């Protein structure tokens, strides 16, 4: 009788949240499973790897630069064009994303990097690259796609979904931060009257 494993493990193994190791074990065992295969998992776990693939395929993406582990980032804003968005390369569910992720100076960029290295999320990003990319102000969309890398004609997608933010939020803050994603509001003020962002 065929077996299908519903794989809900999509974490990062190096911080104790099973992910790629489970996918590889399922593949080695020859079991059918739901979710991405190991090849996709490997390339999609790093935003920098994805951005390089986008660039190589001619897909427009905001300019970016990996930040040094510590010290100043002189000329960063001039090279990429402020404002910038500072974030970890390997992150999901808005971990490490906050209102301070949008920076306007080199000093703010270095400070945000240092916060990611030493703050609440430091354990998640210990071996990760922190990078900055040009902040694109505008609508935020999500598109779910499926298929196989070796069968590009079989790739499908659902209609794009736009995240609509409350008009009270300044345009430069209309992105999904950790507080908004999870509704914890540790760094941000919750919306008035229980309104959703």
Give residue spans per PLM region.
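Conserved N-proximal alpha/beta basic substrate-recognition cap immediately N-terminal to
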Residues: 1-66
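Generic preference for hydrophobic
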Residues: 5, 33, 64, 86, ...
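Flexible, active-site-adjacent loop/turn segments at secondary-structure boundaries
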Residues: 10, 31, 38-42, 65, ...
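Short connector loops/turns at beta-strand edges and beta->alpha or beta->beta junctions
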Residues: 31, 89-91, 183
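Active-site nucleotide/adenylate-binding loops and adjacent lid/helix of ATP-dependent enzymes
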Residues: 41-131, 137-139, 148-151
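Phosphate-binding site of ATP-dependent enzymes
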Residues: 108-195
